[in-house]
Amino acid sequence: MSSLIKEIEEAWQIKDKLFQDSSKLITLKKTLNDIIESLNQGTIRVCEKKENSWEVNEWVKKAILLYFITTESQLYNNNYNSWYDKVAPKFSADTDKNIFKEAAIRKVPGAVVRTGTYIAKNVVIMPSFINIGAYIDEGTMIDTWATIGSCAQIGKNCHISGGTGIGGVLEPLQAKPVIIEDNCFIGARSEIAEGVIVEEGAVISMGVFIGSSTKIIYRDTGEIIYGRIPAYSVVVPGVLPAKEAGKPGLYCVVIIKQVDKATRAKVSINDLLR
């Protein structure tokens, strides 16, 4: 792995001169294709949790960006659409059906998944868009018209509801993508962006918008936090009243309750939100 990282780092330093040496470019393209395939298989990830902290593998982001630089756009076709892109689809008409059967993946018409994404077992993909570098773990549902940004990380047994936007990020290199940990529910038409981390078991109501500067308020205590939804929190949209009379309030999100793991497993989402 260290030699692979070294090759990417060296190529990154001369990314503006890559086309000046054709033999090195051929070697680099093979390496980049291998990395993209490793992303497809989930053996390499853009972001990993180590000792309770999420860390970005910047060299993987660099590899993806180098892949864009060194790959020419081409025309792609399927039975009902055509497009012109540098990034191939992960699945095509030539994909062996046994790949889907063995992994128990269900992908319906209108779902766009770019290569360089990991789709684990028992994932259901409704008409949606999943960008390069994303990681979708086992048993998760990506519902209709959801968008999963580049490098976003989605955990096990999550439900990403219809029309939801999960932000990704390739640049700046050190920036984390949005991370949705295991067993989370993200309500319809919500938007989670700018590297926000939604910790395990959290429930996000419909129509909640969270970025890095969004105030996240504990209703019981008034404490304000940013950039992180604590584990097993139940979150709804809210308004923080202005201190001065007659001034407009500002949007915020409110943690209305926190439940333990056992309660989260037993109680329906609708009951938690009520």
Swiss-Prot record:
Keywords: Acyltransferase, Amino-acid biosynthesis, Cytoplasm, Diaminopimelate biosynthesis, Lysine biosynthesis, Repeat, Transferase. Substrate binds at R106, D143. It is found in: Cytoplasm. It catalyses: (S)-2,3,4,5-tetrahydrodipicolinate + succinyl-CoA + H2O = (S)-2-succinylamino-6-oxoheptanedioate + CoA. InterPro entries: DapD_Trfase_Hexpep_rpt_fam, Hexapep, THP_succinylTrfase_dom1, THP_succinylTrfase_N_sf, Trans_hexapeptide_repeat, Trimer_LpxA-like_sf. GO terms for biological process: diaminopimelate biosynthetic process; lysine biosynthetic process via diaminopimelate. Its EC number is 2.3.1.117. One of its GO terms (cellular component) is cytoplasm. Its main location: cytoplasm. Pfam families: Hexapep (PF00132), Hexapep_2 (PF14602), THDPS_N_2 (PF14805). One of its GO terms (molecular function) is 2,3,4,5-tetrahydropyridine-2,6-dicarboxylate N-succinyltransferase activity. The keyword Calcium does not apply. NCBIfam families: dapD (TIGR00965), PRK11830.1 (NF008808). Homotrimer. Belongs to the transferase hexapeptide repeat family. This is 2,3,4,5-tetrahydropyridine-2,6-dicarboxylate N-succinyltransferase.
